């Protein structure tokens, strides 16, 4: 992981440890949005991983889908 990825994953981890316990479980998906964000950034890099995480967070609301939604695999052609 490069420095940008480490910083972003670290920020998500701080959220998971400091804020998430106080807010309670709100996510409609498995894995949770924060776990999805960490995995997306680790797999796809800081820019694309952040974009995937932001799209996922935008879908995590009442009236949208729910359930199992894994991070897409890395396309080896790119």
Swiss-Prot record:
Record keyword Cell membrane present: yes
Pfam families the UniProt entry points to: YidD (PF01809)
Keywords, ordered alphabetically: Cell inner membrane, Cell membrane, Membrane
Gene Ontology CC annotations of this record: plasma membrane
InterPro entries, alphabetized: Membr_insert_effic_factor_YidD
Disulfide bonds: none
Subcellular location: Cell inner membrane
Chief localisation class: membrane
PANTHER family reported for this sequence: MEMBRANE PROTEIN INSERTION EFFICIENCY FACTOR-RELATED
Function: Could be involved in insertion of integral membrane proteins into the membrane.
Protein name: Putative membrane protein insertion efficiency factor
Native species: Thiobacillus denitrificans (strain ATCC 25259 / T1)
Lineage of the species this protein comes from: Bacteria, Pseudomonadati, Pseudomonadota, Betaproteobacteria, Nitrosomonadales
């Amino acid at each position: 992981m490069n420095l940008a990825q480490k910083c972003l994953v670290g920020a998500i981890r701080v959220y998971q440890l400091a804020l998430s316990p106080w807010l309670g479980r709100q996510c409609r998906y498995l894995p949770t949005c924060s776990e999805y964000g960490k995995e997306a950034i680790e797999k796809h890099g800081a820019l694309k991983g952040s974009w995937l995480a932001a799209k996922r967070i935008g879908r995590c609301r009442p009236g949208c889908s729910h359930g199992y939604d894994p991070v897409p695999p890395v396309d080896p052609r790119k």
